[in-house]
Design a protein with these regions (language model features):
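Surface-exposed interaction/ligand-binding surfaces
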Residues: 2-386
Length: 386
């Protein structure tokens, strides 16, 4: 249970603090060479585990304890020597870290080192990471109004907005659309120790889990790996569309779309590194029973009639199939169902589905389709005209 875990974790942190105090007492009466073992283990534990091989992506550093480590070093007789040794230890350890842990490790180390010269290698790398993240953003955009209601689905566009320079340096971002079963793709994605699956599969899992907390995730449709980035009307910036998520709020209390995250792979002076990019939280209104109609263009409606009528109690079957760029609305919003000499005894809605997603100079669209099967029976006064 979380309560038990927190209790044991705090006890462990207190144990590290006491060990650091005992070490400080020892060094005050000896002239031993500075050792940062206790501080390094304490620091590692703040990242999630004293053995860094057990640290997971989901764990967040305990910033308050990182400051305590710095304070414990500063009260030592040879605080300068210990800060220098700690910085050297951070530099050496960072060469052996997994790509996903390295950025968190180095950022956390600067809370302890601050502006000390021994932290210069870490500062240079963190500055490099910040520069990269200034040039690429993960974006989530609602397809239509943010008044989503709670009875009908709506769509969410997922994409990367980035500078032309970083797109060129990274070799494009379409490689993040490579799935584990993809074949014939021109893109290569690097495999890292501890990486579980292909980038698209990783993103799909994250979207399903994160959005699934408050929404019914009806489908996630990805763009093709051959997609090209598109201009967005901002000089020097482009967009690579990734996916379209079909969602429905679970109830009227839903008030936001949560922060979503995606890992991007780059290289620094030590090797590969994974940097997370996140979307901004978006406020939505799920209270209305009926939300505004979603954008729709290029609507096509096809009718297929099975006119075979072989028995007095049998009816005709009329199939209506609608497609369009956007979300196809319910049948009563599309047509007026007034068929002379027939009554509709049954309407079978096959449901809304996303056939594909398209991207072009004018925008990004989800092409949806919806099929209804109507059972028609002649009215009593239809007479011999049938």
């Amino acid at each position: 249970e979380l309560e038990v875990y927190v209790k044991h974790r705090e006890a462990a942190f207190e144990g590290f603090s006491e060990a650091a105090a005992l070490y400080t007492l020892q060094t005050s009466v000896t002239a031993d060479k500075p050792s940062v073992l206790v501080f390094q283990l304490w620091f590692n534990a703040n990242l999630g585990a004293s053995d860094l091989s057990y640290v997971t992506r989901q764990q967040i550093p305990e910033i308050s304890n990182l400051q305590k480590i710095r304070d414990a070093i500063l009260v030592m007789p040879d605080s300068e020597g210990h800060l220098k040794a700690f910085g050297e230890s951070v530099t050496n350890t960072s060469r052996r870290l997994t790509p996903e842990l390295k950025p968190r490790y180095l950022r956390a180390s600067l809370t302890v080192l601050e502006n000390h010269p021994a932290g210069e290698p870490a500062r240079e790398l963190v500055l490099h990471y910040n520069d990269l993240l200034d040039e690429v953003k993960l974006v989530a955009q609602i397809d239509g109004s943010d008044e989503i209601g709670h009875t009908k689905p709506f769509g969410l566009f997922i994409g990367l907005r980035h500078t032309s320079d970083i797109e060129r340096e990274a070799g494009g971002f379409a490689r993040y659309l490579v799935g584990g079963s993809s074949t014939g793709t021109p893109y290569f994605y690097p495999r890292y120790p501890g990486q579980r699956q292909a980038p698209r599969d990783d993103l799909e899992e994250h979207l399903g889990k994160k959005l699934g907390e408050n929404f019914e995730v009806q489908s996630i449709t990805f763009h093709d790996t051959k997609i090209q980035s598109r201009t967005i009307g901002e000089p020097g910036w482009r967009e690579t569309p990734l996916a379209y998520v079909l969602l429905k709020a679970k109830d009227a209390s839903v008030d936001r779309i949560p922060e979503l995250q995606m890992d991007l792979d780059f290289y620094d002076s030590l090797g590969p590194v994974l940097l997370p990019v996140t979307t901004a939280t978006q406020i939505v209104d799920a209270r209305p029973e009926s939300a505004p109609a979603r954008p729709l263009d290029g609507l096509e409606l096809m009718q297929t009639l099975d006119s075979r009528l072989t028995g007095e109690n049998e009816g005709l079957t009329l199939e209506l199939h609608a497609t369009g760029k956007g979300l196809t609305p319910p049948l009563d919003k599309l047509v007026t169902l007034d068929i002379p000499d027939f009554e509709i005894t049954k309407t079978d809605d096959q449901g809304l589905s996303i056939a594909r997603v398209e991207s072009g100079a004018l925008g990004v669209n989800a092409v949806s389709e919806r099929t209804w099967l109507l059972t028609l029976k002649p009215t009593a006064d239809a007479g011999e005209s049938l």
